[in-house]
Amino acid sequence: MFKQLIIARRDLNMSPGKLAAQVSHASIAFLLEKLYWGGKEIVEERDGLMYHIGISLDRDLFHNWIAEAETKVVCRAKNKNDLLKAVKIAEELGWEENKDYWLIYDACRTELEREGPEGTLTCIGFRPMEAEEIDKIGKKY
């Protein structure tokens, strides 16, 4: 069984809407990465210029996650340091940022205060993977 893990910071006290938005960003980050780098080609069509994008998805990922239930597990980290522990574990497992996991930063235009030049780190989203793999991190939250 494939599933996707997302871990969000609890200490930010995000409103339900803000939390939903940040978790949504984390959930689609792996697909957006593929779409962005998927070989854009601008073509003229009846409705104007269009992008045609080709992406490659792992067969097991497609059949066991996308074509099925798209199982997601959302957990909470106590604070930024607790969230960064997930990054450390991921790196120890040989996983790479922007390939296996994505750090999600809020631009701080509404309710959060900026923590650094990138904004505020709100959550981490992992690409969907086999449950026994992602549980190596998920079970700690």
Predicted regions and their residues:
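Positively charged, small/polar-rich N-terminal and surface patches that mediate targeting and assembly
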Residues: 1-141
